[in-house]
Amino acid sequence: MAKEGAIEVEGRIIEPLPNAMFRVELDNGHKVLAHISGKMRQHYIRILPEDRVVVELSPYDLTRGRIVYRYK
């Protein structure tokens, strides 16, 4: 269930960071810092560099986001 007003964009994982954080390059060229959503963490979904993902951005801070889906 997406939050009200969240912006969903696609991107690619550039590098993993500590504490389940990742640097993601969006399709439009911007780089954001993103963490894994709770459901993905709960189901042990692994994310590796170069994976394609969907990131949910808050309209208040476009430099941080939450990874909500990993493409197969």
Swiss-Prot record:
GO cellular component: cytosol
Pfam families per UniProt: eIF-1a
Domain of life of the native organism: Bacteria
This protein's UniProt keywords: Cytoplasm, Initiation factor, Protein biosynthesis, RNA-binding, rRNA-binding
Sample GO molecular function, one term: translation initiation factor activity
Compartment(s) of residence: Cytoplasm
InterPro entries documented for this protein: NA-bd_OB-fold (IPR012340), RNA-binding_domain_S1_IF1 (IPR006196), S1_domain (IPR003029), TIF_IF1 (IPR004368)
SMART domains membership: S1
Predominant localisation class: cytoplasm
S1-like domain span: 1-72
Subunit field text: Component of the 30S ribosomal translation pre-initiation complex which assembles on the 30S ribosome in the order IF-2 and IF-3, IF-1 and N-formylmethionyl-tRNA(fMet); mRNA recruitment can occur at any time during PIC assembly.
HAMAP family for this protein: IF_1
Record-stated family: Belongs to the IF-1 family.
Role summary: One of the essential components for the initiation of protein synthesis. Stabilizes the binding of IF-2 and IF-3 on the 30S subunit to which N-formylmethionyl-tRNA(fMet) subsequently binds. Helps modulate mRNA selection, yielding the 30S pre-initiation complex (PIC). Upon addition of the 50S ribosomal subunit IF-1, IF-2 and IF-3 are released leaving the mature 70S translation initiation complex.
PANTHER family, per database record: TRANSLATION INITIATION FACTOR IF-1, CHLOROPLASTIC
Protein name in UniProt: Translation initiation factor IF-1
Species of provenance: Corynebacterium diphtheriae (strain ATCC 700971 / NCTC 13129 / Biotype gravis)
Gene that this polypeptide is encoded by: infA
